[in-house]
């Protein structure tokens, strides 16, 4: 279990203090995979480094497995850190040591004998699918294999908590997918509490149970992953979820959008589907009820856990008088609708 209570962190700078984290409250339950997402500079790395006190908060408490780390002496804190594994974006492997030796290194520092070390390292090589690479040096490993070594090394002290700091950012999409599947397997087999930070919503969507959205050092939204996708409340959460579903207005139309309604032209809408609304013919009913001309620009349906979510971009022609009633109808049916803007008939004709 991980808990942050009222954690604040400020860095000193020539022009005054820089607030990295402000009054952070966060709880990761035992066995849970919890994601923190935010843009670059949001404070993600500072947050995760506060968990094991690589960065010490200016105020607030950090609690891991019921132990208040912020009150511990240096000696006791070092012992407590053995229960916390950490994986970074960069692998930080020792180039002159094999995969086995890199994984074993923390145990050697703890004074374990070779027999004890072997009993721990061999199962981890198997768990991370590295048995065939036991004697390989980092220069002989792919990026994904290096990250697997780093993960095994983080697990070698039998931690209850695993901290992952942008661990897939340096990997290609296929390798990222395999590493995330490994992380899910580790969570299932070892029942670890996993806290991961990322700027990629695809990572959150793939592995996290719950997610917090971090913006300018503050948690602005927190929810289970499915609920966040269904009903994002903040603008930054909406941007993350919309970018993940990969439905985007063509640039030629974005450049021609106007904010005011037009007598002759098109209204461009983004319509979000969730739950049963993704599986019922609501748009067909909408077209018939209001006798509309509808152009579907883009549409996508995805399945997340046991739910379906989707998004559609549509252009409605000459709807100045009926648009408010149409949006109210769609909202009543459980759809979320956002008016992106308006395009004149001439601009539409020459798109």
Curated annotation (Swiss-Prot):
Keywords: Amino-acid transport, ATP-binding, Cell inner membrane, Cell membrane, Membrane, Nucleotide-binding, Translocase, Transport
Catalytic activity, as annotated: L-methionine(out) + ATP + H2O = L-methionine(in) + ADP + phosphate + H(+); D-methionine(out) + ATP + H2O = D-methionine(in) + ADP + phosphate + H(+)
SMART domains hit by this protein: AAA (SM00382), NIL (SM00930)
PROSITE patterns for this protein: ABC_TRANSPORTER_1 (PS00211), ABC_TRANSPORTER_2 (PS50893), METN (PS51264)
Record keyword NADP present: no
Assigned EC number: 7.4.2.11
Gene Ontology cellular component list: plasma membrane
Residues the record lists as binding ATP: 38-45
Superkingdom in the source lineage: Bacteria
Record domain ABC transporter: where: 2-241
GO molecular function: ABC-type D-methionine transporter activity; ATP binding; ATP hydrolysis activity
Locations listed in the record: Cell inner membrane
Membrane-related topology note: Peripheral membrane protein
InterPro entries membership: AAA+_ATPase, ABC_transporter-like_ATP-bd, ABC_transporter-like_CS, ACT-like_dom_sf, MetN_ABC, MetN_ABC_transporter-like, NIL_domain, P-loop_NTPase
Subunit structure: The complex is composed of two ATP-binding proteins (MetN), two transmembrane proteins (MetI) and a solute-binding protein (MetQ).
PANTHER family in UniProt: AMINO ACID IMPORT ATP-BINDING PROTEIN, METHIONINE IMPORT ATP-BINDING PROTEIN METN
Family: Belongs to the ABC transporter superfamily. Methionine importer (TC 3.A.1.24) family.
Chain's role: Part of the ABC transporter complex MetNIQ involved in methionine import. Responsible for energy coupling to the transport system.
Name used for this protein in its record: Methionine import ATP-binding protein MetN
Highest classification ranks of the organism: Bacteria, Pseudomonadati, Pseudomonadota, Gammaproteobacteria, Legionellales
Gene encoding the protein: metN
């Amino acid at each position: 279990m991980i808990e942050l209570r009222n954690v604040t962190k400020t860095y000193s700078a020539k022009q005054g203090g820089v607030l990295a984290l402000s009054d952070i409250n966060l709880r990761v339950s035992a066995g849970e995979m919890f994601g923190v997402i935010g843009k670059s500079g949001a404070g993600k790395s500072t947050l995760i480094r506060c968990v094991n006190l690589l960065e010490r908060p200016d105020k607030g408490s950090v609690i891991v497995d019921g132990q208040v780390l912020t009150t511990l002496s240096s000696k006791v804190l070092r012992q407590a850190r053995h229960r916390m594994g950490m994986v970074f974006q960069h692998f930080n492997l020792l180039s002159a040591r094999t995969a086995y030796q890199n994984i074993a290194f923390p145990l050697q520092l703890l004074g374990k004998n070779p027999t004890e070390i072997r009993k721990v390292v061999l199962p981890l090589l198997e768990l991370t699918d590295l048995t065939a690479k036991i004697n390989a040096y980092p220069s002989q490993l792919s990026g994904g294999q290096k990250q697997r070594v780093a993960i095994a090394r983080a697990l070698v002290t039998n931690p209850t908590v695993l901290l992952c700091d942008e661990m897939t950012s340096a990997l290609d999409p296929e390798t990222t997918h395999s590493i995330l599947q490994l992380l899910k397997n580790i969570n299932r087999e070892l029942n670890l509490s996993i806290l991961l930070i990322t700027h990629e919503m695809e990572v959150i969507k793939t592995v996290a149970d719950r997610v917090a959205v971090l913006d300018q050092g503050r948690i602005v939204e927190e929810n289970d992953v499915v609920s966040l996708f269904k009903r994002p409340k903040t603008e930054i959460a909406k941007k993350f979820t919309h970018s993940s579903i990969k439905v985007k207005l063509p640039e030629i139309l974005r450049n021609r959008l106007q904010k005011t309604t037009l007598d002759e032209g098109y209204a461009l809408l983004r319509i979000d589907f969730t739950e049963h609304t993704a599986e019922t013919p609501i748009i067909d009913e909408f077209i018939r009820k209001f006798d509309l001309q509808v152009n579907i620009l883009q549409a996508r349906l995805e399945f997340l856990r046991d739910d379906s979510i989707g998004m559609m971009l549509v252009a409605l022609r000459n709807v100045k008088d009926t648009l408010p009633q149409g949006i109210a109808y769609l909202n009543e049916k459980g759809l979320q609708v956002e008016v992106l803007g308006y395009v004149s008939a001439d601009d539409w004709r020459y798109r």
